[in-house]
């Protein structure tokens, strides 16, 4: 059975969209089943309350049902950070027996750069280089954590 990934990422400019598509393709190539909220639900900026609630509920349900939350933290998108916090809250309070693996991807973090304290502490696996993506299946299968130990902000 494939591990189900909830793919949290900003997608508001061409660079973000390119990174999102590249990473989703890589995760699928690595054998993961990838849920993309952008592909499943799309909410226009002027959408009414009913559609907004449907999108919100659908995304929350998908986070609850995933095995892994993969969050692209480049750009510090508020929605992505909220999704990661929700997954961490589920781990802590709601479903502690079915712990989700939280992976943060930050390719724009410079060597020696500062990573957010809350993300550093809640992430099970931190990836800062695209080439390290190939390690992800083995890290998940082994249960190994790859925490961030650099400077924090």
Residue spans of the language-model regions?
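Conserved catalytic or regulatory cores that recognize and/or transform ribose-phosphate-containing ligands
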Residues: 1-153
